[in-house]
């Protein structure tokens, strides 16, 4: 039995938790971003800059939806296959791909993890934006005992980051 599931989940109308679970209050607002090489920052700033470029996204994710809606019409190729984040970063740094679409927190983590010999970031975020429906991350909480969701929501209110 799992009491709390946390995996960057957003409440969608068609994402049902069943009778014994509820969504928590939101704990984080995600902005969409593209992770790119630092050397490309001056030329890759907005959707039209990605014409002819390759953007990798996780299949069926918010990044995939965003890629199809925001960058594909501008002429970008959207590739929805992620063998691993390490492999995607390797492809990005070697120039095999041009960007990795993710939420800002995930891409910020990757950018901070890959530094040059001077401690400077090799990767940076660009085109940070919210989707039409704001992405509010929530926890899936077992609700057999109503005290658990109440306690979690109380904690989230005290530590609000939105």
Positions of PLM-derived features:
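Bilobed "Venus flytrap"/periplasmic-binding protein-like clamshell domains
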Residues: 10-11, 30-88, 104-108
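A ligand-binding cleft/hinge motif common to bilobed small-molecule-binding domains
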Residues: 6-18, 66-70, 97-133
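Non-transmembrane alpha-helical segments in soluble domains
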Residues: 89, 93, 101, 149, ...
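Short, hydrophobic alpha-helical packing/hinge segments within bilobed ligand-binding/sensory domains
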Residues: 1, 23, 87-91, 97, ...
């Amino acid at each position: 039995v799992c009491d709390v599931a946390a995996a960057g989940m957003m409440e969608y109308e068609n994402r049902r938790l069943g009778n014994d679970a509820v969504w928590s209050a939101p704990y984080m607002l995600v902005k969409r971003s593209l992770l790119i090489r630092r050397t490309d920052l001056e030329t890759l700033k907005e959707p039209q800059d990605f014409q002819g470029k390759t953007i990798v996204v996780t299949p069926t994710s918010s990044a995939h939806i965003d890629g199809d809606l925001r960058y594909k019409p501008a002429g970008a190729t959207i590739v929805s296959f992620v063998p691993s984040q390490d492999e995607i970063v390797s492809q990005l740094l070697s120039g095999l791909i041009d960007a990795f679409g993710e939420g800002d927190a995930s891409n910020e983590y990757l950018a901070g993890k890959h530094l040059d010999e001077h401690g400077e970031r090799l990767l940076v975020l660009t085109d940070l934006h919210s989707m039409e429906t704001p992405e509010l991350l929530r926890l899936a909480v077992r609700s057999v005992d109503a005290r658990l969701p109440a306690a979690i929501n109380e904690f989230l209110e005290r530590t609000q980051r939105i």
